Structures are given as C-alpha cells and as structure tokens.
C-alpha cells in the first residue's frame, strides 16, 4: 500500500513539473486598455474614415516590441462626456489603464482617491516619462505643477502633476461670422445677451462651461476694473500673477449668492440665444443657422478650416476681454492600472513627432512643444520669406524645447499671415492667457450648481413632462448627430498633409 502511494506521489510530481514547463512556454501577452474622447488620437484614417496607415496605438505596440522583444496588445474605447466616463469607472463595468478626462474631472478623481500616482518629483519630473520632461511646454508644466487638489481619503494635497500628464489644451471663446458680427460685440460675454444678435448665438450644453459664461457676465464690471488696474500697473510678475488669480477666483465662485445670480443670468440668456449644443454648433455656423458659436479652441479651428474649404463664409475667433477659461485634458491612471505599461505608452505619446501627428489629426493643440511642433505650426501659419506678417512671441510655450536655429534673438517668434483666426485659437498670446483662468471642480457645491442648471434647462416645464420631452429629443438627437457625423467625417481631419 505504501509503495503504491509512493508511486502515485512521484507520478503527480512529474505531471506538475511538465505542467509548469508548459505554462512557462506560454507567456501571457500584456494588454493596455485606453479610454479617450472620440476623434482624439490619430487612428490612421483618411478623409473618408477609411484605414490607410497604422494608428498611433499600433505604432506604439510595434515600437514596444522592438525595444523589449515582447508583444503587447491594446484595447481602445471612447466616450462622449466626462460624466459618462466617470460612471463607467465607478460601476466597475470596464477597467482601464489610462483615461483622458478634462481638468476639472481630474480634480474630482483625485479628490475621490480614484487614481494611481505617477513616479514624479518636483526636481526631476516624471521618472518613467522623460519625453514629457524634455518636450512638455513650460506653460502647461507650470499649471500642473502649481495647482493642488486634496485627496479626501488620504487627506493629502498634491499637485496635479502627481496624478496626470497633460495631453491637449485650449481656450474658450466665440467663433463668429466676420461679415455679420462686429469684433467689438463678440469681444465680450455680453453678446449672448445682446438683443442685436437675438437667436444667432449658442451656448454649451455643459454646466461647467456655461457657468463660466454666466459668472463672467454677472461680474463683468469687476473683471473690467481688474483689467484696467492691471493695464495701469508696472506689469511685474507679481502683477500678472495677481490678475490671473483674481480672474480664476471670480469664474470659480460657487457661493449661494453667485449661483443664484448666474441662474438668473442664464435664464435671461435663454430668451435671446438660439440654443444649447455640444457638437452641432461648429456645423450650424457653417450653414448660416447661427452667426456666433460659443466654442472650444479645437472646434473653432475645425469650423474655420471647413469654412475656408467651402468658401461660403469667413469665420473668426475671439476671446472675451473680461476673461475666459484655459482648459487642459490629461492622462490619468485609474486605481489598479498597469502603471508600467501606461507610462511607456505616454512616453511614446510625448515624442514631438507623435504629438504632431495627433495634433494634425484632431485639430486641438498639444501640450508638447519641440522642433517638430514648431515646424508644423510654421508650415500652417507662417508667412513666406518675402512676405510681411504679424510677429508673435511664443517663448512662453516653446522656451527650452526647440533648437537655437529656430530662435530669433533668443525668442521663439513666428511671423504669421493673419490674426484673430486659426492661429490665435491654437496659440493665444501670453497676454491673452493672463486673463484666462483654470476651471475648478464644484466641490461641496456640486449639488447646488446642478440644481441651478436643471432650473435653467427646464424653465417652467413640469418635471416629468420635461423628462419625456428630453427623451424624445435625445433619440432624435442621436439620429441627427449620427447623420451629421457621417456627412462630415471626411472633413474632421486637418487638411495639412505633413504629419497625416
């Protein structure tokens, strides 16, 4: 009996050893899971949406294989709103290694302890994303290294740089028909309330963005007084910092009194504007449905590019004198992410040549600088050698990232052929950015602001009637949006060929 047991044990051990050997031979392939905005990375598509080359994701996988000898796979999915993205993560229905939220949602995710940290310190930057250390714009770096958010779970307050790596950035302003709208009128948020342009303007169907418009309108006198005070100052760095900090504070006032004032202002605005929108405004202005579109900079570029191609209307871009928002989207790693793989991918994304590809594909402005980005914007916007133009100093963005041969007297100066259009939507001057503040999360006043937004959107319509009405509109809107997307897909790509 003992002999049989002994033989059985030997047999089991032999099987186990063979099994281990087989398992070692079957090496598992790592998978990177990425969750991003729609049309927010170069997917290797042509103007008709057909696959013509490798996507950025595929190029990274090939590059990873070349460097490490290991295969890697990826899953790439998209979302349309921050709210939807956050709900997916919180329900646990999907797991991702990298997500690209807006700045105020980065704050929200930090505060709720939803994110992994990057290996980062103030002196040396990102240990495993050196390309961002080398080529990240000093302007964008300063924002992420200056702003802090409190993690409510750990009671630790750290800068955004510990949790996020910037991707794209831009401003909020107005795209407008230059033949029908006066520049002085569109240079103020008041244009949304201006009866001269009744039913000709749109506002964003986004509580954060439209709240800023309301606050800027409510506190216009205070903002213009600040502007005059700054203009009369010596414009020292201390003066500049104070001016920007005050604008940021005003646009992020969420006290009960301000919420009430903004609610009244937005309800009044509804009587004068064409309607709320998120994506349709950039096409409505092309067809003449509206003449003023409250827009993000990247969408403004799309509208102006398309208008130039079609030749039906000349569009411009203006950032209101009172001030506006400068926004940033950044890459964060949800808890449980494959940090090593995520950081490797981001280091690839922060190469200037890859950043230029993405920027050329989607129309928004990359947070990466460097020679390739400088060459790209010169191809797009600079005058020829024998032409006169408008010199613009972009040292605030490119300082320390481009070679000496591109500098003029030590400065990153580009001479552009026109102002107030695509170039200014992508690269506003340092002076303009002084009056642009960063949007903050609503924090403890979140419920109060959302209630205000419901009141603005619903008006006098009864609750359940409004819900039913909205459901009908949503179904119709999805169908219409799908048709628009099909019709306009081939025009979504920038028409510049160098990096496509």
What positions do the PLM features span?
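Early extracytoplasmic/lumenal segment of secretory-pathway proteins
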Residues: 25-112
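Ligand-binding pocket segment of bilobal, Venus flytrap-like solute-binding proteins
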Residues: 203, 210, 214, 222-315
């Amino acid at each position: 009996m003992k002999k049989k047991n002994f033989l059985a044990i030997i047999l089991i051990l032999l099987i186990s050893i063979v099994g281990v050997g087989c398992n070692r031979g079957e090496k598992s392939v790592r998978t990177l899971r990425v969750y991003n905005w729609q049309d927010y990375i170069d997917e290797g598509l042509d103007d008709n949406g057909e696959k013509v080359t490798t996507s950025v994701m595929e190029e990274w996988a090939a590059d990873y294989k070349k460097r490490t000898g290991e295969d890697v796979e990826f899953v790439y999915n998209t979302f349309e709103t921050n709210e939807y993205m956050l709900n997916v993560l919180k329900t646990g229905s999907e797991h991702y290694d990298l997500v690209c939220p807006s700045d105020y949602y980065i704050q929200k995710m930090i505060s709720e302890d939803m994110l992994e940290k990057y290996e980062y310190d103030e002196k040396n930057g990102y240990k495993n994303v050196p390309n961002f250390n080398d080529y990240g714009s000093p302007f964008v770096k300063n924002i992420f290294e200056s702003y802090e958010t409190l993690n409510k779970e750990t009671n630790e307050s750290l800068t955004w740089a510990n949790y996020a790596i910037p991707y794209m950035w831009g401003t909020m302003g107005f795209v407008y028909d230059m033949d029908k709208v006066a520049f002085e009128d569109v240079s103020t948020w008041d244009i949304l309330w201006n009866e001269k342009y009744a039913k000709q303007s749109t506002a964003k169907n986004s509580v954060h963005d439209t709240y800023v418009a309301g606050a800027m309108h409510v506190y216009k006198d205070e903002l213009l007084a600040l502007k005059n005070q700054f203009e009369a100052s010596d414009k020292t760095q201390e003066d500049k910092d104070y001016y920007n900090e005050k604008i940021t504070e005003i646009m992020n006032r969420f006290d009960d009194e301000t919420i009430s004032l903004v609610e009244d202002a937005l309800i009044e605005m509804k009587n004068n504007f064409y309607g709320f929108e998120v994506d349709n405004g950039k096409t409505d202005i092309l067809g003449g449905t509206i003449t003023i579109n409250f827009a993000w900079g990247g969408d403004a570029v799309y509208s102006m590019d398309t208008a130039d191609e079609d030749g039906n209307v000349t569009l411009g871009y203006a950032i209101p004198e009172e001030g506006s928002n400068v926004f940033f989207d950044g890459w964060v790693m949800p808890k449980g992410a494959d940090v090593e793989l995520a950081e490797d991918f981001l280091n690839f994304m922060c190469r200037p040549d890859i950043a230029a590809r993405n920027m050329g594909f989607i129309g928004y402005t990359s947070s990466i600088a460097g020679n390739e980005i400088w060459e790209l914007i010169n191809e797009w916007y600079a005058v020829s050698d024998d032409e006169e133009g408008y010199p613009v100093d972009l040292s605030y963005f490119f300082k320390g990232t481009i070679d000496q041969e591109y500098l003029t007297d030590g400065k990153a100066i580009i001479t552009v052929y026109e102002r107030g259009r695509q170039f200014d939507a992508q690269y506003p001057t340092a002076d303009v950015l002084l009056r642009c503040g960063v949007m903050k999360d609503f924090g403890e006043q979140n419920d109060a602001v959302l209630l205000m937004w419901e009141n603005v959107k619903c008006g006098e319509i009864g609750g359940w009637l409004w819900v039913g009405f909205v459901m009908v509109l949503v179904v119709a809107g999805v169908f219409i949006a799908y048709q628009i997307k099909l019709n306009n897909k081939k025009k979504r790509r920038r028409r510049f060929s160098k990096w496509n």
